[in-house]
Regions:
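Intracellular effector-coupling site of seven-transmembrane GPCRs
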Residues: 179-189, 200, 220-264
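Fourth transmembrane helix
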Residues: 73, 84-87, 112-122, 129, ...
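Loop architecture of class A 7-transmembrane GPCRs
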Residues: 10-19, 88-106, 111, 144, ...
Length: 371
């Protein structure tokens, strides 16, 4: 579509399309399989651990569970499409069920991406009020549920166009699944260019700038509290340390999200605005761009376990229970101290319990057309 939209004269200067090599196909297939099972297992563990332990069911962890759910949706929709593309390109199967999946799978893959970045934004704002403005009421569980539902509804509204534009075409006797807004290819390409820019701004640029602004304020606030001459008692030091670990985890997640999705956005813009340069990129490089975007789904649960002692301890106890075939007893429960330390950064009641101790300082992330 992009080549046709640029006209035959411009297309004459394009680099010749190179087929996917067998080594690239095998290598990426293995990588995608590892990614699929790692992301599915890791995010399922996060959801299970939170569900099993009442002390971990904080508003902040509800957002982490939402992130894990969106990552699972990403790998079960986008990974099969990406692997299929390695072997059959955009070929599809005919019939009503073929039309249904052609529209549904791209929509769900995009939906998960939008829900992830919006959830990250909500988590950032939640941490800002919990750390910088603790006297203001943070998100309640009811408001958190509303925020979670909104992340999916807003993402669904933004990407609802996938349900319209993806359709089946007959290309030289082969059925393919591809997006097209209108029958005229040039007009469809212009609409797609506008669409890519809007999505980049709404679901990449604006959220990242928003998160960068809030995290800058959080880091500045924590740095001031750590300055020499600022007296903090032992219990407050423990809570402050846990807050810093949570912020470090979130900043790492946001940074990796930005890094993982940037190459795909660059690829989209080259495809839309500079087809000549895009056509000269090695096919294996473009496919690697998209693998990088989905690898984010497997990295996130690792970060939760690395930075969060409560998650790690909950996971260890679950493994111990399975191996010993026993149920939790008093000695096997989560460490109350660690769980409360983490909850102190995410729970309104815990924030109120530290109110007097900080009174003097309280003002302060399948084919070129699909992905």
């Amino acid at each position: 579509e992009a080549a046709a939209a640029n006209g035959s004269d411009h297309s004459a200067g394009l680099c010749r399309s190179q087929p996917v090599t067998q080594s690239t196909t095998v290598g990426l297939t293995i990588a995608y399989l590892v990614l699929f099972f790692a992301a599915l297992l890791g995010n399922s563990i996060i959801i299970y651990v939170v569900q099993r332990h009442p002390k971990l069911r904080t508003t902040f962890n509800m957002l982490i569970v939402n992130m894990a759910a969106s990552d699972i949706l990403d790998v079960i929709t986008a990974v099969p499409l990406s692997v299929a593309y390695l072997f059959v390109s955009v070929k599809w199967f005919p019939g009503g069920f073929g039309v249904f999946l052609c529209k549904l799978l791209p929509f769900l893959a995009y939906l998960s991406m939008g829900a992830s970045v919006l959830t990250l934004t909500v988590m950032t704002i939640d941490r800002y009020f919990a750390i910088v403005r603790p006297m203001r009421r943070p998100l309640s569980k009811q408001l958190t549920m509303v925020a979670i539902i909104l992340t999916w509804l807003i993402s669904g509204a933004i990407f609802a166009t996938e349900l319209y534009k993806f359709r089946l075409f007959n290309d030289s006797g082969q059925v393919i699944c591809a997006p097209r807004w209108v029958e005229n290819i040039q007009d469809s390409h212009k609409i797609t260019m506008f669409e890519k820019v809007i999505r980049f701004v709404l679901l990449y640029l604006v959220p990242l700038l928003t998160m960068a602004m809030f995290y800058s304020k959080i880091v500045l606030h924590l740095w001031k509290r750590k300055a020499p001459g600022v007296h903090i008692d032992k219990n407050q030091k423990r809570i402050e340390k846990q807050k810093r670990k949570v912020v470090t985890m979130l900043v790492t997640i946001v940074t990796l999200f930005a890094i993982c999705w940037l190459p795909a956005h660059v690829n989209h813009f080259l495809l839309m605005f500079n087809l000549k340069v895009h056509s000269c990129l090695p096919h294996s490089l473009i496919l690697t761009f998209y693998f990088l975007t989905h690898s984010n789904a497997a990295i996130n649960p690792c970060l939760y376990l690395v930075f969060n002692e409560s998650f790690r301890e909950g996971f260890k106890h679950q493994v111990y229970n399975r191996l010993s075939r026993g149920n939790f007893n008093g000695s096997e429960r989560l460490s109350t101290t660690r769980a409360e330390a983490f909850s102190a950064t995410t729970s309104y009641n815990s924030l109120l319990s530290t109110k007097h101790g900080i009174r003097r300082d309280f003002g302060s992330a399948a084919c070129r057309t699909m992905l």
